[in-house]
Each structure stands twice: as structure tokens, then as C-alpha cells.
């Protein structure tokens, strides 16, 4: 188990109700999502003296904190767990990339409509469903739809040029409308209608129509057709059965607030098409003496009215608190959405159950947060005592990441009195240095960070340098050379050298670039907060470096051809049906693409061949 995670204290705050839990590492990255019929019993099983597998043992060692979401039923917990896995891609569940966008599913207006992912403006003729929380969610939905309703998903350029059905037809995931005689117009239209109803949340209508068709086929002695429709009914039921949904299938956001010990937790439950898509807890800073109604009012205004184009307004917002200016806020949200948005504070029926669920989760999240904050306060006080400082209000930590000196990225993470201040985490692209020179990289990032005017509240009490005497000496040299108006002597520079075999708990701390360092006991709270900020900085640097490296790696040859911009690339790929067909095309075939001259076609042909 992670040394910085107090399992015993955490388990005291956990309920025995069904729900979903998310486990985080030191970098606040979700590393595992699970569901349980009894959250307390399930989570307690991770912290026994003997765990079930090596995977579980490795997982538990990485845990820094855990969030839980309570649900009505275990089935709902399972569905919510699936949404969270798609959203967070935890490394102990799956390894998928998240596009961090809000894509939609597009059902085209073609004679034989196709299903596809869509992003951006809605210019194409057809129907749009969504938005979905991320790219993985929409792709998983398309795969599911393909299994339930075999509507084509191929590009029009591929569809128009087929003379025989593709593999998707062979495995039963497309009806093959590209080839005459494989499917009737009526049968294909019926499957498209099922897709339309299913994506609109009208699952029962889909089932009713399928049951009617199955009974009709059976009466007409078309038993093979009846069996096929029966299998389709069972597949749809497996997806939709037992989920707790609001009866009308509308889009709702359910917001509840909990307040204790000077801290507020605003919990938002997201419901789309009557289904729970996910939830999130927010902890706004609340000045002393603020009324809870004002907290909710301010939060709702900031949450929906600050120009976040990726966030869509629901049809209805449910609140557990009466707002002072409810009518004004309703009018503002309606104007922004371009349609009626309602705010309800006294719902009934299913809506009341959702609000009760949000209240429970808000209270649970607040208890967990207060417990974590208490631990952070104790650790910072212990570190201040070790460093002989009166107190620590702000810490910053730096780390460098690169691969063989390439794509060097420096990270800066910030802790305040309550722990990680992620809104102030920063990454710096390092350039103009000898590849692999970590000292020069550290000097550059420190100069860029501190060689400018700083507000007093932004001056750190402690600056942690991930490195030994050499890196600390570099940092001290930079600070000696600073020509700034703020007190450059205020921050205490602390070097952290990794122990033998890079094992946690064996770190050596340096306050001076010369002389001996000091080691703290492995169970020292002061060491734990140093490890926490150091690990956060390390993860933040690696994350930035990987993105930078992937960007370079994923730059295709097509992007490097002069005269081929984003629009022409898109036209080429759509017309040819992808990069591989384009690479296999002749000059004449490339020249047939709209907007591509013969001369440019030659240039593209030779660039792709060589």
C-alpha cells in the first residue's frame, strides 16, 4: 500500500451501499475504476495483509487517494463503471487514448444512411446525436450499434466503389447495401429507424417493434427470420435492462452541495437521454460567512456561462437549494442555449431520487476531501518543522523529462496549504540547449519561471528540485543571478536525490550544493509530502514529454508536402478512402481528386513513394 494513503481512515468514511470507486496515483491520474454491491466491503478487500494477485498488489502500492460514487443499484454501478473506464482509461483497466473532445454520432442523409463520428460544425445533411463525453465513448457506442443494428459505417468513397460485400457483411455487422440484392430497401430503412430510436433513448420502442416483427415472422412460418430477430431483441435487452432512468429520457444535470468545516463540495450528476453518464465533485473556495444559496448560484453561473464551448446545457437542472436569483439565471441559461432551460428545486418521482443520490454523494465526497486535507496539513507542518520554517503556504517542484535528449519538457507543480493546486501546474518546452543537458534545462525553466515580476502570493516558501547537489547548485546559481523586484531570498531551495535503486523512502535531501545531505525516516510525514510533490512533478513532466514525442512521431509524410494543407489532406483521404489507398494510387488517380492538379499529384505521388 502507498505510504501516503491512510486506508484505515478512508474506510471509516465509506458507505456499504452499491457504487463505483476511482483510484488515483500521486499524479492524480485515475489508475483503476471498479464497482461494488457493497463499497465498504469491496474496498476493504484491497487492504488485507494478503491480496489476490500481483496486479492488485501493484495497484495498491500506487494508490494515493480514492473517490467513490454511490448508485441506486449494482447494475447501475456497472454501467457507470463502464462510462468511467471509457472516460479515464485507467492503466489497470484499459490502455486507450482519449481524444478529450466532445464528438457526436452522425447518421447521414444518404439513400443508404451511414453511421460515423462527427466533430465540429453541423453542415452535412443528416441527424446528430450527442455530444458524448469523449472520443472513446462515441467509438464504443458505434461498435455497440454495429453489433445491434447492422447499418453501414464505411466512407462514401468506399461504399460507391464496392462490387462485392466487405468483411463487415461477412461477420454480420453490415447489411451490405453497397451491393444490389443483398438487403431490401425496407429492411435497411427499418434498421436505420432502430438506430434513430435507440440513440434518442427510446429503447422500449425499439424492443416493441422488434417483438412485433418477430411474432409476424413466426406466424408466417419464417422461423429463420424470427430467430434472427429474437437474437437482436436479446442483444438490445442485455444493453438496456435494469438501468435506473428518468421516465422521459431528457437531459438533466443534478447539482447538490454539502458544506462543513469551511469547505463546500458541489456534486454534479450528468444524465443524458435518461441514463447516468458520469459525475464529478467540485470544491470551490468559499469565503467565510457565505450563504450556501450564493455558493450554488455562483457555481451554476460559472459552470454554464463562462464560454466553455465543449459543455452543452441540459434541458433541465435539478438543485437541492433555492437560488436567490433563480429567474434571472434561468433566463440567462435559456438565452445561451437558444432553447428553454428549466431549473427545478423541488422535483418529484425519479428526479427526486436523482437529487437524493446527488446529496449522498456530495456529503461522501466532502468527508473524504476533509480527511485528505487534514493529512496534508499535518505533513506540511512536519516539513516546516524539519526545514525550520514558521509554516509553508506554497511549494513548487521542478522536473525534467526527455528521451535521449530529444523533446525535452520541464514541469512545475504547485502545492498550497490544501495540497495540489492543479490549475497552476505548468509545462515548459525546453530549446536551445545541448541535448541531454539536464542542468541547462533546469536553469532555463527556473529563469523563465522566476525571472519576472511575481505577486507576493505567488512566491513559494519552498522550491523542490528533483535532483542532487548538481541540480541544486544550478538552481542556486540562477537565483543568485536574478534581477527582480520581489524577495528572491524568500524561497528555500531543496534538492531531492533519489535513493539507491531509486526506491521510495531512501531519498537524500540537500539544502546546500556542498556538504552532506540528510535522510528522513521512511514513515516521516515530511518525507511523504516531498515524495508527493516530487512524484506529481515527475508524472507531469513525463506526460508533457510523451505528448510532444507523439506529436512528432505522428506527423505523417502527407503533412510535410508543400501545397497540401489541412483541407486538401482531408479531401485526399476522404476521396481515396484512407492513407493506404492513397499510397497505392497512381498519379492519374490522385489527379482525379477535386482540387488536386496534375503537378501536385506528381509531387504527392513521389513524396509518398519515397
From Swiss-Prot:
- Cellular component aspect of the GO annotation: cytoplasm; excinuclease repair complex
Protein's job: The UvrABC repair system catalyzes the recognition and processing of DNA lesions. UvrC both incises the 5' and 3' sides of the lesion. The N-terminal half is responsible for the 3' incision and the C-terminal half is responsible for the 5' incision.
Alphabetically, the GO molecular function entries are: DNA binding; excinuclease ABC activity
**Per the UniProt record, which residue ranges are transmembrane?**
none
| Annotated signal peptide | none
Where found?
Cytoplasm
Supply the NCBIfam families for this chain. PRK00558.1-5, uvrC
Annotated UVR domain residues:
204-239
Q: List UniProt keywords, sorted A-Z.
A: Cytoplasm, DNA damage, DNA excision, DNA repair, Excision nuclease, SOS response
> What are the annotated disulfide bridges?
none
Q: Which Pfam families match?
A: GIY-YIG, HHH_5, UVR, UvrC_RNaseH, UvrC_RNaseH_dom
Read off the InterPro entries from this record: GIY-YIG_endonuc (IPR000305), GIY-YIG_endonuc_sf (IPR035901), GIY-YIG_UvrC_Cho (IPR047296), Hlx-hairpin-Hlx_DNA-bd_motif (IPR003583), RuvA_2-like (IPR010994), UVR_dom (IPR001943), UVR_dom_sf (IPR036876), UvrABC_protein_C (IPR050066)
Family statement: Belongs to the UvrC family.
Chain ranges of the GIY-YIG domain? 16-94
How it assembles, according to the record, is: Interacts with UvrB in an incision complex.
Ranked from the top, the taxonomy reads: Bacteria, Pseudomonadati, Pseudomonadota, Gammaproteobacteria, Enterobacterales
What processes does the entry annotate via GO biological process terms?
nucleotide-excision repair; SOS response
Q: What is its main location?
A: cytoplasm
Q: What is this protein called?
A: UvrABC system protein C
Organism of this sequence: Pectobacterium atrosepticum (strain SCRI 1043 / ATCC BAA-672) (Erwinia carotovora subsp. atroseptica)
Amino acid at each position: 500500500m502507498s505510504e501516503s494513503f491512510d486506508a484505515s481512515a478512508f474506510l471509516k468514511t465509506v458507505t456499504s451501499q452499491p457504487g463505483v470507486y476511482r483510484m488515483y496515483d500521486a499524479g492524480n491520474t485515475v489508475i483503476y475504476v471498479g464497482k461494488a454491491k457493497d463499497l465498504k466491503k469491496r474496498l476493504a478487500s484491497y487492504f488485507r495483509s494478503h491480496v489476490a494477485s500481483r496486479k492488485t498488489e501493484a495497484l495498491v502500492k500506487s494508490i494515493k487517494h480514492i473517490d467513490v460514487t454511490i448508485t441506486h443499484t449494482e447494475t447501475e454501478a456497472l454501467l457507470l463503471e463502464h462510462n468511467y473506464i471509457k472516460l479515464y482509461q485507467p492503466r489497470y483497466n484499459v490502455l486507450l487514448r482519449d481524444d478529450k473532445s466532445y464528438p457526436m454520432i452522425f447518421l447521414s442523409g444518404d439513400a443508404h444512411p451511414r453511421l460515423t463520428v462527427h466533430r465540429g460544425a453541423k453542415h452535412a445533411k443528416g441527424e446528430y446525436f450527442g455530444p458524448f463525453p469523449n472520443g472513446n465513448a462515441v467509438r464504443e457506442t458505434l461498435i455497440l450499434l454495429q453489433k445491434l443494428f447492422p447499418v453501414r459505417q464505411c466512407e462514401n468513397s468506399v461504399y460507391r466503389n464496392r462490387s462485392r460485400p466487405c468483411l463487415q457483411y461477412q461477420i454480420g455487422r453490415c447489411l451490405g447495401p453497397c451491393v444490389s440484392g443483398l438487403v431490401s430497401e425496407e429492411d435497411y430503412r427499418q434498421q436505420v429507424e432502430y438506430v434513430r430510436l435507440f440513440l434518442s433513448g427510446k429503447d422500449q420502442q425499439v424492443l416493441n417493434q422488434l417483438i412485433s416483427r418477430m411474432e409476424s415472422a413466426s406466424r408466417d412460418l419464417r422461423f429463420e427470420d424470427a430467430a434472427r430477430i429474437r437474437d437482436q431483441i436479446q442483444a438490445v435487452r442485455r444493453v438496456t435492462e435494469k438501468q435506473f432512468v428518468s421516465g422521459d429520457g431528457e437531459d438533466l444535470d443534478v447539482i447538490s452541495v454539502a458544506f462543513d468545516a469551511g469547505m463546500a463540495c458541489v456534486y454534479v450528476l450528468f444524465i443524458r437521454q435518461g441514463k447516468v453518464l458520469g459525475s464529478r465533485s467540485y470544491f470551490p473556495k468559499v469565503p467565510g460567512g457565505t450563504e450556501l444559496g450564493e455558493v450554488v448560484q455562483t457555481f451554476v453561473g460559472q459552470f454554464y456561462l463562462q464560454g466553455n464551448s465543449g459543455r452543452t446545457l441540459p434541458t433541465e437542472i435539478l438543485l437541492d437549494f433555492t437560488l436567490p436569483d433563480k429567474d434571472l439565471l434561468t433566463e440567462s441559461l435559456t438565452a445561451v442555449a437558444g432553447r428553454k432551460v428549466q431549473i427545478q428545486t423541488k422535483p418529484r418521482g425519479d428526479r427526486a431520487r436523482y437529487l437524493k443520490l446527488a446529496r449522498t454523494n456530495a456529503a461522501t465526497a466532502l468527508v473524504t476531501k476533509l480527511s485528505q486535507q487534514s493529512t496534508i496539513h499535518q505533513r506540511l507542518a512536519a516539513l516546516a518543522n524539519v526545514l525550520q520554517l514558521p509554516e509553508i503556504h506554497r511549494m513548487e517542484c521542478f522536473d525534467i523529462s526527455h528521451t535521449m535528449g530529444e523533446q525535452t519538457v520541464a514541469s512545475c507543480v504547485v502545492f498550497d496549504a490544501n495540497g495540489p493546486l492543479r490549475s497552476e501546474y505548468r509545462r515548459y518546452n525546453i530549446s536551445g540547449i545541448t541535448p541531454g543537458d539536464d542542468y541547462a534545462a533546469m536553469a532555463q525553466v527556473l529563469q523563465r519561471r522566476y525571472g519576472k515580476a511575481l505577486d507576493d502570493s505567488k512566491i513559494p516558501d519552498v522550491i523542490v528540485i528533483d535532483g542532487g547537489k548538481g541540480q541544486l547548485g544550478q538552481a542556486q546559481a540562477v537565483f543568485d543571478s536574478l534581477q527582480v523586484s520581489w524577495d528572491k531570498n524568500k524561497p528555500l531551495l531543496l534538492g531531492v536525490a533519489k535513493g539507491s535503486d531509486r526506491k521510495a523512502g531512501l531519498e537524500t535531501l540537500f539544502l546546500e550544493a556542498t556538504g552532506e545531505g540528510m535522510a528522513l525516516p521512511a514513515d516521516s510525514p515530511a518525507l511523504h509530502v516531498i515524495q508527493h510533490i516530487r512524484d506529481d512533478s515527475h508524472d507531469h513532466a513525463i506526460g508533457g514529454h510523451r505528448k510532444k514525442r507523439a506529436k512528432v512521431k505522428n506527423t505523417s509524410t502527407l503533412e510535410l508536402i508543400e501545397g497540401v494543407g489541412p483541407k486538401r489532406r482531408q479531401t485526399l483521404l476522404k476521396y481515396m478512402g484512407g492513407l493506404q489507398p492513397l499510397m497505392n494510387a497512381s498519379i492519374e488517380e490522385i489527379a482525379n481528386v477535386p482540387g488536386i492538379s496534375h503537378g501536385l499529384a506528381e509531387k504527392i505521388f513521389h513524396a509518398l513513394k519515397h
